[in-house]
Every structure is written in C-alpha cells, then in structure tokens.
Amino acid sequence: MIDLKTKAFDIAQNFTISLDGPAASGKGTVGLILAKKFSLKYFQSSIVYRQLAFNCINQQIDITDIDAVIALSKELKLDNNIDLENEDIGDIASQIAVISDVRNNLNENLINLVKTTPRIIMEGRDIGTVVAPDADLKIFITASPYVRAIRRYNQLQAKGKTCILDEIIQQIILRDKRDKERKAGPLLPALGAFIIDTSKLSAIEIVEEVTNYIKNKIT
C-alpha cells in the first residue's frame, strides 16, 4: 500500500482531498492554495447546483415543480462563460439542493469526476461523506454565520456587485438550516475529518492551519 506522504508529494500518484463546510467558510481560498501546493485539480461542487439554478431561471422553470427540476438535473452541462457568483442564484441553488433525486443525479457526475481525476481536491457540503468517502484527506472548515456573511459581502463588493449585509446574513443562516436538515447528504463533518473553526483566522492563518495538519498527517 502506498503511504500518504508518497501520495501527497509524488504527482504520479492518485491523491484526493475532500474539503467540506458551510457557505463562505473559507473553503475556496484554502482549496485553491492547496491545489497549487500539491498539484491537484480544484473543483467547486456547488458550481453544478448553481448551474442548475441558472438553467431553471433561464428556462423559466418553477423550482416548486420538483419533477421538472429533477428532469433538468439529468442533462446538466456546465457553461464556463456564465457568471454564477450571484446571491439570487446561490439562494435558488440552496433550495434545489435539498431535493434528493437532484443531489443523486448531480452527485453521479461528481463521483465520476473524482474517480477519473488522479489528483483532485473537491470542495462542497458532502464530499467527504457522500461523493468521496474514501478521500485520502478529509477537511471540514466552518465559521460563525456573521463572519461568513462579512466575507461574502466583501467578496461581492470587491467584484462591484450590489449587496446588503443583513440580507446576506439571513441567507447564510437559511442555507445552513437547509444544508443541515436535508435528508440527502446533510452538512456534517466526515468521520475522521480535520475540523477547523476559521471565525477568528485570516485567510493566511487558515491555510497555515490546514497545511500544518496535512504535514502532520503525511510525515
């Protein structure tokens, strides 16, 4: 059996990291840096739900029409030319993500991506528990709703997008509730995952914490 240290540093070996946590907890920043450090493909699983949400809006599909949403999820194709970083799209994505058949359909694509990509770090809500339960390293990142709302607000402001902090806070609280209470793939740490609360940590400190954890696991 190939040891974890070899998997991490030998780019000829398969190496998978699952990176889970609630919205705006710092997963994206950490994931991109770790991907570069260990020569991994980085994939944000929420993009498939945002793409589906965009398609529902574009095709004027009422998301309360469960059968129509499920049918659309079976033929999903990603369009990299679309800006999906929109709070309205994110809110709809959160609502349709609670539909079990939608998650099952989209997870088939994610599971296949993990299996066919030798070196990958996949970010999401249920990667370590459902999509990649056999990941070599499992990380769960969290932070208080207020801190996460501030981060999302600053991200959107930096992109020149109009947003209201109080609305973002309420959206995050509601998304957390949906994520934790859904029947399929609820948000929770995978067994054996490294759990880190980033509420009082900067992006650099978060990366240092995770990197130190990885170093301890592979030495």
UniProtKB/Swiss-Prot annotation:
SUPFAM superfamilies per record: P-loop containing nucleoside triphosphate hydrolases
Gene from which this protein is expressed: cmk
InterPro entries, A to Z: Cytidylate_kin, Cytidylate_kinase_dom, P-loop_NTPase
Enzyme Commission numbers on file: 2.7.4.25
NCBIfam families: cmk
Subcellular location: Cytoplasm
Coiled coil: none
HAMAP family: Cytidyl_kinase_type1
Entry annotated with the keyword Membrane: no
GO CC terms, sorted: cytoplasm
Major localization class: cytoplasm
GO function terms (MF aspect): ATP binding; CMP kinase activity; dCMP kinase activity
Pfam families attached to this UniProt entry: Cytidylate_kin
Residues reported to bind ATP: G21, P22, A23, A24, S25, G26, K27, G28, T29
Phylogenetic lineage: Bacteria, Pseudomonadati, Pseudomonadota, Alphaproteobacteria, Rickettsiales
Name of protein: Cytidylate kinase
Gene3D superfamilies: P-loop containing nucleotide triphosphate hydrolases
Top-level division of the source organism's lineage: Bacteria
GO terms, biological process: pyrimidine nucleotide metabolic process
Reaction equation(s) it catalyzes: CMP + ATP = CDP + ADP; dCMP + ATP = dCDP + ADP
